[in-house]
């Protein structure tokens, strides 16, 4: 049944305002989220079934990076002595936090099939295999030593704000089961390694929420990743033509400037696009010729004037569009919204919270929508 949500009280309005930012969170579907939010989360969440790799001979690890060695010694509670290949070859998920004030998270020996990419606290089987380890470390700059982690499927690297970029990704080439990779800024000289990561399905690149800290000067190596379907980039100015050959299903951009969206027309399988908290964009026109079905253009209050001079007409010309969030787009008007609803029979989920069109919500024909959210400014 169609749901119509309006500003009935201050608490509800506050919750809806927070929903403008919720799409930037990696949250699983749950009982406290709307159907529209659940749909978005389902489209942007990668399941990583646990598996175990075959191991070769055992040997003493000769460490290349002392910071990585410090992390592993802390995990093993082994401040001195040799560390063997067999000590690390069953690690399936690793979160390394350096200088962030948060402990590392390690998952090993998870039963085959358990989703190790999910939220540990909400999965008993996963939680039983997870360990959090506190420690104080310098930022990680090399991932070369991860070549010894045969079973690694999920890897998150988080360095403190302002840390130097990672200089070496070569160890990841040997992680043949790696599916989900999240890394902060990487030096340009290390980017070619991305093209060799054939098993990675989801890549989160850049310091989370800190655009200026991420090197995005040349992303062409990402377009050569054979299995890559889901890409989230945080950075400054991004040239999408460098990604034109990528076979992406999901593209999420938290960047300062994109410029042209023309490259989207060459991504025939791209179904979800998130423009997170506003970017400088030349025109929305290429969206009309894209394959995008799920489009998030929600803005925070601080960024609500980002698209004030843009023409939203191309959004009314997207025949495959199913899901659209325009929260805080302060120049999306009633006339354009009426065109959108009249022309797009595929559209099922629409959020126009805090837009001019929301003031005239009663005039809009939303009968075909599954969910319509429109608290007025």
Predicted feature residues:
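Bacterial signal peptide processing site
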Residues: 22-25
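Ser/Thr/Pro/Gly-rich low-complexity linker/stalk segments immediately outside membranes or between
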Residues: 27-40
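Positively charged n-region of N-terminal signal peptides that target proteins for export
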Residues: 1-7
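Sec-dependent N-terminal signal peptides
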Residues: 7-16
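Concave beta-strand-loop units of leucine-rich repeat
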Residues: 93-141, 151-167, 171, 177-190, ...
């Amino acid at each position: 049944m169609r749901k119509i949500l309006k500003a009935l009280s201050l608490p509800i309005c506050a919750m809806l305002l927070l929903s403008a930012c919720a799409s930037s969170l990696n949250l699983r579907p749950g009982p406290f989220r709307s159907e529209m939010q659940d749909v978005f989360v389902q489209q942007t969440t990668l399941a990583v079934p646990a598996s175990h790799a075959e191991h070769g001979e055992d040997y003493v690890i000769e460490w290349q990076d002392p910071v990585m060695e410090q992390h592993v010694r802390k995990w093993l509670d082994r401040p001195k002595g040799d560390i063997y290949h067999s000590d690390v070859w069953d690690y399936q998920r690793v979160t390394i936090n350096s200088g962030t004030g948060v402990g590392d998270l390690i998952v090993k020996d998870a039963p085959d099939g358990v989703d190790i990419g999910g939220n540990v606290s909400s999965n008993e089987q996963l939680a039983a295999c997870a360990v959090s380890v506190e420690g104080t470390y310098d930022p990680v700059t090399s991932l070369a030593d991860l070549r010894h982690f045969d079973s690694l499927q999920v890897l998150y690297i988080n360095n403190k704000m302002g840390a130097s970029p990672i200089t070496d990704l070569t160890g990841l080439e040997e992680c043949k089961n790696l599916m989900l990779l999240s890394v902060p800024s990487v030096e340009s000289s290390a980017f070619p390694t991305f093209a060799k990561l054939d098993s990675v399905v989801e890549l989160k690149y850049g310091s989370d929420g800190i655009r200026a800290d991420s090197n995005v000067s040349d992303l062409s190596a990402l377009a050569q990743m054979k299995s890559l379907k889901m890409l989230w980039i945080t950075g400054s100015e991004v040239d999408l033509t460098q990604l034109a050959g990528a076979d992406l299903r999901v593209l999420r951009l938290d960047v300062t400037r994109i410029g042209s969206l023309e490259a989207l027309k060459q991504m025939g399988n791209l179904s979800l696009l998130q423009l997170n908290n506003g970017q400088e964009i030349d025109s929305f026109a290429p969206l009309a010729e894209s394959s995008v079905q799920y489009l998030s253009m929600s803005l925070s209050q601080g960024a609500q004037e980002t698209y004030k001079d843009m023409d939203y007409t191309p959004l009314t010309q997207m025949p495959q569009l199913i899901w659209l969030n325009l929260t805080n787009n302060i120049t999306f008007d009633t006339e354009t919204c009426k065109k959108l609803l009249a022309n797009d029979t595929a559209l099922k989920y629409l959020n126009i919270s805090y837009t001019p069109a929301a003031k005239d919500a009663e005039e809009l024909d939303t009968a075909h929508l599954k969910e319509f959210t429109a608290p007025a400014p």
